[in-house]
C-alpha cells in the first residue's frame, strides 16, 4: 500500500487517474516495486500480467494498457527491456498472455497492438527461448484450429515476425514443416485477408535462399498453380500487393522462374489442387495488372516482368511479347509518374533483346511514345530516369532491323534528333554519356532515309555532341589536381575523359558512315522538296564539308590533347577510321586534308601507334585501321604532289599494291626501321617491299616537315639502301627512287658530300630513267644536290634547272620591280640558287640555254632570276662568260633561221633583254673587246633581218646597241659606230622606223621609236665626229619631224625628247651629216630671202619648231624640258651663225617671257632647276631684256644667295656656273660683294663633289627604252 501511495503521490489529478488505469488496484499493492517502470508511463508489469487476461477488465482498458506499453517500448526501450527480462519465466508468461489476448480478441485494433508489442519485445530481447516460445504458440494455435477462420491474427504475427527476424524463415521451414500445410489451407480459405496474410508470410519465407531451396518441391507440387490463380482473381489491393511481393521473391531464383514461365514441368498433384487454374499464365496475369488504373500495381507488375527477363530475355521475352505486354508498357511511358515511366523503360529495355519484339513492329508503334517520354523526362531532374530512357532509346535504335523503318515521318526523326541534342548537352556526365551511345545508333542510314534527310538537324546534333565533349575535356583540364596525393583522382579523370571521348568519336564515326552510305542515294543528295529557285542548304555536300571542318577544328585537337596524357588503342582505332572515312566523304578535299595531316605529324603518330600496340598479333584491328589510314593518306599525297609531277596510273597502281602489302608488316620504332633500311644483306621480296614502304613514309613525312628521324642517320641509311639495290642488281620503283634522291638531298649536311661510288650508283640508276621529271621533287636542296656534283651536273644540270624553274612559284614580278623602294627579300629557293651561281659560275651558261630553249613562262622566270642575281652581285664579273655564250647562241640562231629570226624562238627577246642588262651593268667606260664587237655585229645583223613589227626583238636589241655606244671609250665608240654603220639592213630598218613616227598613239611602237631616234642621233653624231664611211643614207622629212613635235603623242614625252635629241644633233651639224639627209615633203614654195639664208630650213619651219619647243616646255617634264632647252640652244646657235638678227628676234619674243615665268611658277626655288637656269642663260646671252629684266636677274641672284648650294645636283651646279659666267661676261653683276660671295661659294665646291646629293646614274631604262641622260641633256 505504501508503494502504491508513493507511486501516486505528488502527481496532478488527471495524470494520476491515467496512471491509476495502468495499475490493477486489487493486486498492485502485493507487487514488488521492481516490476514498476520508473518513468512515465508508470507501468507495472505484474499488474499487466493480471489485468490483461482478466475477463472482468474492459476491452478499452486493456487496449489503453497495450498502447501505453507500446509507447514505453518506443520511448524507453532499454528500461522496458530491463523490466521484462528480469525473470525469464515472467517474460515467457507475458508473451503467452499477449498471444492469448491476440487469439481471443476480434477487435482489429487490439490485435494490431498485440502484434506490434509482441514483435517489439521479441526483437528487442533477442532471446532464443522467447522466440521459440512464440513460434510454438503460433504453430500450436494453427494446428488446433478446425478452420482457418480465426487464423488471420496468427498468420499476420508470423509474417511480421519473420520480416523482423529474417533468420526465422529457415527455422520455420526446418522445424515447423507441417506449417506449410496450414498455409495452403489459408490460401484456399475464402477470405482475401487470410490469403493476403499467407502470401505475405510465404514471401518472407521465400526471401531466404535456404528456405526457398527447401520449399522448391512444395512450390512445384502445391503452391504455384494455387498462388497464380489467387493473384489472377484477387480483388483487394492488399492481396494483390502481397501476391506480387511473393512473386518478386520467387522471381529471384532461376528455378522458380522456369517453373512459373513453363508450367509443363508441374506435377499432376499441383494441377489438381482445388482452386487452381491450369490456363492461367504469368504474362496474362501481369498484363491484367498493367491494365489496372492503380499506379502501384502497374509499377509492381513492371518490376515482376523485369525480374523474369533479367534471368534470360531470350527464354522468356517471347511469352510477354505474345501477350502484347510491350504495347501497354509503351502507353505507360506517357504517365506522369516518374517511377512508372522508369519501370516501363527498364522492362522494355530487356524486351528489345528479343528479335520478336521488332518483328511484331512494337517499336514502330511505340517509338513516338519513347521520344515524347524522353523529351518530357529531360525537363525533370530525375537523372536515373534520363539514363534509363536514353538506354531504352539506344537499344531500340541499335537493334531495330534495317528492313523495318523505325521513323515513318521526317518530323518524328527531327524530334528524336532534337531530344538527343538536348540530352548530349546535359550537364550530368552520365546522362550525356548515354545520349552519346543513342546518338551513335541514331545516325544510321535506315533511321535517316525518310525524305527529306534533315542534314541541318544532324549537323546541330553533332555540334552539340562535339561541344559537350570539348567542354568536358576543358573542365577536367582546368580542374587538374596538384600533388602526388591526387594522382589516383587524376588517372580516374583521364580514364573518364577517355571513355567520353571514345563515345563521342563513335558517334562522329557513325555520322561519317552515314555520309558515305548516302553518297549512293540520289534522293539523299539534297532536299527534293526545295523549290528550284530557292537556295539549297540541306545538302549532303554541305553536311560532308561540315564533317571535315568539325573533325579538323574539334575532333583532332581533342584527341591530340588526350594523347598528351594517355593513349587508348580503342580510341585511336575509332579516330583513325574517322580520318580514313573523311577521305571518302569529301573526295575533292582528300589531297588537301592529307597534306594537312602529314604536316601535323600524323605519319609519325600512326607509326608510333603501330610500334607500341601492334607488334606480333596484338591489336590486329588497330593495326589494320592504322595501315588503311596510312595507305590512303600516302596514295593521296603521292597522287597529288605539291611541286612535282604526279605518277602515272601504272606507277600509282604499283605503289598501291606495294603499300597494301607492306604497311601491315611495319610495327617497328624509328631506330629499328632505320637499321632495317640500312641492312646490306640479301633481301627477299617481302622484306624489300617493307623497305620500300619505310622509305616512302620517311619521304612523305620529310616533304611535309615532319622530320622525326635523325637526318644524319637517315642519310646513311638511304645510301646503304641504294647500294644494296645495286649489289643485288635491282631497280627500285620510280617513286621509291624519287624518295631516295629527295631524302639524300635534304639530309645531306653542307660539310658532308657523297662518296664517288655513291654518286656513280645514283647516276647509273638515273640513266635507266627516261625523264628526270619522273624522279624530281621540287626543293632548293635537290637543285643543290644535282648541281654540286660535276658528274650529275654535266648530265642532268640543264634538265633539273628547267624543272626547278618550271615548279617555282615565287613572286618574280615583284623581284623584277626595280622601281620599288628597297630590295625585296629573296625567297629561300633563290638564296640557294644564288649561292650556287656564286660558287659555280658555269651554271649561268645553262641558264642562258634555258632562256633560249625553255617555254616562255619558264624562260621568263630564269631571266628575272638572272637579272636579280646580276643586280645584287655586281662584284661578280661574269659578263665575258655570258656574252661569249650568248654570241654562240646568236650565231647558231642566225645560221639556222637566217631568213626569219623572229620565228626561231619565242625566248629570243628574253635573251636580248638579258644582254642589254649586262651592258647596262657596266658602270664605267670600258674598251669593247672582240666578243663585244662580234656581238654588236651579230645583233645589228639580227636587227637588219627584222621588220618594224618585231618589237619584242628590236627593243632589247636597240637598247643593247645604244648602251654599247654610250658606255665605252671614245675610241671604242668610233669602232662600234663603224661596225653598226656598215649594217645596211639596220640602216634601212631605222629609216622605216623614223617614217612611222606619226603612227597611232596607242601603237606598241612608241618605245621602239624612241630607241630608233636616239640611235639615229647617236649614229649621226659619231659619223660626223669621226668622218666614218656611210653605206646607207637615212632620209628624213623635216616637215614630218616638226609635225611630230607640234602634235606630240599622249604620254610620249620620251619620244619627243628623242626627236629633239636628233634635231639638236642635226642643227649642231648644220644639217651637213653624211648619214642623215633631209628631204622635202611634197611640192615646196619658192624660197624667200630669209629662207635662202637659213637653208635648208625655212623661216616657217623655224617658227614651227620654236612654237613646238615652247609647248613642250610648258609640260614641265624634267627630261623633256632639258631636251627642249638643248634643242633651242642649238637652234639659236644655228640661226645666229646665219642671221644674228633672226636669232635675236627669236630669242626676244614676248612669248618667251610668258614661258619663262610659267616655268618659274612651278614651285619654290624653281629657278634652281637646271633647264630653267640654262633657259635664262640663253636669253641673257642674246640680251633679251624684254624676257628677263635686270631687276629680275637681281631677284634670282638674291634667291641663289639664300639657297643651300650643297643640296644641288651636279647638273644644276653646272647650269648655275654657266648662268654666272654669262652674267659676268655681260657685266650684269652690279653688286660686287654679292658676286664675289656667290663665286666663292661655287668655286669652293669641287666639280666632282659639289653636290650633297648622290650622283644620278647616267644610263637608265625608262619605259623599256635605253636612255643616256647626258646624251639627251647635252
Swiss-Prot record:
Keywords: Disease variant, Meiosis. Changing residue 309 to F: Found in a patient with non-obstructive azoospermia; uncertain significance. The keyword Amino-acid biosynthesis does not apply. GO terms for biological process: meiosis I. The keyword Mitochondrion does not apply. Gene3D superfamilies: Leucine-rich Repeat Variant (1.25.10.10). Transmembrane segments: none annotated. It comes from the Eukaryota. It is linked to Hydatidiform mole, recurrent, 3: A disorder characterized by excessive trophoblast development that produces a growing mass of tissue inside the uterus at the beginning of a pregnancy. It leads to abnormal pregnancies with no embryo, and cystic degeneration of the chorionic villi. Susceptibility to azoospermia may be associated with MEI1 variations. PANTHER family: BCL2 INTERACTING MEDIATOR OF CELL DEATH, MEIOSIS INHIBITOR PROTEIN 1. Required for normal meiotic chromosome synapsis. May be involved in the formation of meiotic double-strand breaks (DSBs) in spermatocytes. This is Meiosis inhibitor protein 1. It comes from Homo sapiens. The lineage of its organism: Eukaryota, Metazoa, Chordata, Craniata, Vertebrata.
